[in-house]
């Protein structure tokens, strides 16, 4: 427990820090900022309950000594000396911002997003602290009472959490110990001779990253399939990308699935398929609509609701979010005899943007479940 007159602070994971105290090591390298493990989590007591506070964290040098690792031990280096330039102290404000003292004392204050690096090119982020290898560092917690602006800042050096930044673990036991608790812990260790090795108990995981050539080939394959799509209709500039683009995509039986769920196979620039877009009678035997001709149009362009399949009648209610009303279509109304029909705004005839972005053709399906495009017939 670290104490001061105003309040008390304790590391939430103090037991883990003590297992390697005072020689904890943290990996840093040129691959990017690295997390600190065990994490920097704190419990605070002794605050004024109704005052508001901000909590800040900094990573500061423990001393001005340059260390070395020899004969299995850390100690002051007899060959190299510490840098004389003083390091600028950087503070990281806790993401939660201001909180009441009673709130801070009820919860664990976590700085799990803090990272460290030994390359200044990664210093552009607020949560990244620059550290030098072969030096010892200590986290410092600062608590500021912003309700009473005249009160002084109070800082705590969390000496139980002191650590050495290293590019590889000098103590093999630390790498093994961290791997038990932290899934991202590295197994790299340094032998007495200065060589790197991987822990023999670790298993090599196959890389999931594609090489540049593999990625380019995959992209070309997708573009080739898209350009050769059999369902591409040049006359209406409509088509859809085949499921065969990737063998990992689940394949559905095309005929039965399209007949039951035509919304799952939409075509580009084609209106949503609603019941009101099928004024032609439905052939139950062939499971499709009759070709839309003047003879097959329902009288007065009113649909015979009983001739429509259930999936068409229920589409609007079942898939309202996927297929909202198009702005050029009015809402549906009822004729005196109760059959629904559709209004259309005549402004589409003079609206070039509409004609270029929205086709007035409807999609039906043939015996094989493939879309058939019929021209739009104006109502009588």
Swiss-Prot record:
Name of the gene: tbx-40
PROSITE patterns (UniProt xref): TBOX_2, TBOX_3
One of the GO biological process terms: cell fate specification
Subcellular location: Nucleus
Keyword hit for RNA-binding: no
Name of the protein: Putative T-box protein 40
A GO MF label: RNA polymerase II cis-regulatory region sequence-specific DNA binding
Disordered, as annotated region: 188-215
Keyword hit for Methyltransferase: no
Composition skew (Basic and acidic residues), residue ranges: 189-215
Keywords: DNA-binding, Nucleus, Transcription, Transcription regulation
Cellular component terms (Gene Ontology): chromatin; nucleus
Binding region for DNA: 11-192
